[in-house]
């Protein structure tokens, strides 16, 4: 559990994955391209796991089980799709025989380790993360 105003460990791992996806995307896109197009491509690439805080994922699943559909802001479409994909994976695992005895909390932890359809961030926020990384790294930014 994270403390007030602290940075969650999962978000640090997510930022590392964004940089890995950035390097992968640079090799895959056709040049000439722009940073915005690269970030749009990264936003659609699959991630190695769900980069959601465990408590947030658990609360979302509990609300969905009760029949409520949590509201997201109008600018959080990517996050809403990610949570919905997470919930569908949760339901799929719940039906499997080997997970029948798992409690909801433990099944959420298992689901968080599954591959995610995307990183769950809008391209502009991905671009901000990448720009901040290279600004703080104090090296030249080469896009090729």
Explain the meaning of each model-derived region.
Residues 81-85, 105-110:
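Phospho-regulated, low-complexity intrinsically disordered regions of nuclear gene-regulatory
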Residues 40-61, 109-132:
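Short, basic interhelical loop/turn and adjoining N-cap
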Residues 1, 125-144:
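C-terminal engagement modules used by replication, chromatin/transcription, nuclear envelope/ESCRT
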Residues 1-27, 31, 40, 48-100, ...:
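Basic, amphipathic alpha-helix used for nucleic-acid engagement in HTH/winged-helix/SANT-Myb modules
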Residues 34-37, 103:
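Short, solvent-exposed linear patches
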């Amino acid at each position: 559990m994270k403390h007030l105003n602290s940075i969650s460990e999962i978000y640090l791992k997510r930022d590392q994955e964004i940089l890995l996806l950035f390097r992968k995307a640079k090799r895959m896109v056709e040049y000439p391209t722009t940073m915005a197009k690269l970030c749009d491509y990264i936003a659609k690439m699959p991630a190695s796991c769900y980069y959601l805080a465990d408590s947030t994922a658990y609360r979302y699943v509990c609300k969905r089980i009760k029949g409520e559909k949590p509201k997201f802001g109008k600018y959080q479409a990517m996050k809403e799709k990610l949570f919905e994909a997470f919930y569908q994976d949760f339901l799929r695992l719940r039906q499997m025989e080997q997970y029948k005895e798992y409690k909801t909390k433990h099944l959420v932890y298992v689901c968080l380790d599954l591959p995610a359809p995307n990183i769950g961030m809008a391209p502009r926020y991905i671009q901000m993360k990448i720009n901040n990384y290279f600004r703080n790294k104090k090296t030249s930014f080469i896009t090729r």
